[in-house]
Amino acid sequence: MKMKKWLAPVVLTAVAAASITGCGAGTEESSGGTPLKDAKAAAEDTTPVTIQYWHSHAEAQMPGLNYMLEEFAKKYPYIKVEPVFQGAYTDLHKKLQAAVAANDVPAVTNVEVSALPNFADSGVFADLGPFIKRDNIDMNDFSKGMLAAYAFNNKQYGFPLIVSTSVFVYNKTMLDKLGVKPPQTWAEIDEFNKKVTVKEGGQTSRYAFSVPGWDTWYYDPWISNGGGSILTEDKKAAAFDKPESLRWAQNFKKWMDEGSMHMGYGKGASDNMRQMFLQEKVAMVQHTSAVLKTYLENAKFEVGVSFIPGDKKRESHIGGAGIVMMDKAPENQKEAAWKFVKFMTSAEHNIKWAEGTGYLPTHKSVVSSEQGKAYFTKLPQYKAVFDNFDNVAPRLQHPGYPEFSKIYMEVVGKMILENADPTPLLKDSVKKINEVLADYK
């Protein structure tokens, strides 16, 4: 598979490294060339070691991270973890590329979910499979979709760490007064719109709902829920010339033309949508679950949460970042790195981590624990997500996604800003997307 220019330094370095270290044969190996029998011995090794953890945790997440680091140090006093903040995800990814090219990588790092395929495809992340098998990790305790988001080509490269999904945040006080509930299916949306939308002088003064137009992450699940797809099943061509792959956009255009649906696009769109909701100019907004506390703390009315409505299927997509091991980390750091990854994503501290960061728990078992019960008593709004735990799915996994997703996002922008018909524009986008895909064949 041909890689794009932005990953060229990574690929060249990885290939060069493989030509040097990849000549051994005849031994079952774990990731990075360590024989499994040596890995088992390493599991018992208590020789002091220091590892770096590169991350993008915002300041608000630091209490949660500091708690985890303190607990990890208690359990593994011989492993010193140095957390290194590397900025936003895009900055972190650029620094990872440079680190791989310089052959000087951290042992553990965050990776934003949509970037994982590109890095994994270039061979820079360690395959966690041998460690998972050795330590009998209960993979069934994770959400299926959350795990799938950090797997690529049938290998598990990471675990979900700071996980969000898009949900509908709604004005429960308003909807209760109107005697309506958030739509659970597309078939219920028209009736919901009629009862909630308010117009004055031909202009909408209160929208029924809002969907962000500034990020494809928000409308990708609408594509799949409508029975469509972004790419064909073999991922070799765009699918926006198929009727089922156009339904989402055609419905968006219809609901916008009727004045019931609002979409934000461009600079300041997220803040504007949030303010519209708080000012009761829109009854329901699709937003990341990571900002739920912001709505709860600022709304002067009761806030509810609903899973996004479905049609042919019903799913929402994973957001946030996972935690991975770098394949070319020094051999003496790999066991410590695995212990850290396993600890950070274990069920034992999952609720404390979620509370400290504002992101979602990732284990099914914690829901029924005492900590879990207290968590859902405090934040009952999250129950809508956990009622659909296995319907939280990975977004489309393709190394070219960051590039070709911009093409159909531009179509949405024209629909919002220029009132353009999205159907011919999406059909025209097929050729452009296919040109991008050609670089990955």
Regions found by a protein language model. Give the residues of each.
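Short, low-complexity disordered leader/linker segments with a strong preference
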Residues: 1-51, 74, 424-427, 431-441
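Hinge/lid segment of periplasmic solute-binding proteins
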Residues: 37-39, 43-44, 113-166, 190-193, ...
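Short, polar/charged alpha-helical segment
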Residues: 37-43, 58-80, 407-408, 426
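Short, well-ordered beta-strand elements
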Residues: 38, 46-58, 79-84, 107-108, ...
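Extracytoplasmic "Venus flytrap"/periplasmic binding protein-like
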Residues: 70-142, 149, 173-184, 276, ...
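Extracytoplasmic/periplasmic substrate-recognition and gating elements
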Residues: 70-75, 80, 177-178, 250, ...
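Long, aromatic- and glycine/proline-rich binding clefts that accommodate carbohydrate-like moieties
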Residues: 145-149, 303-306, 355-414, 439-440
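Glycine-centered hinge/linker elements that transmit conformational signals in sensory
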Residues: 192-195, 235-266
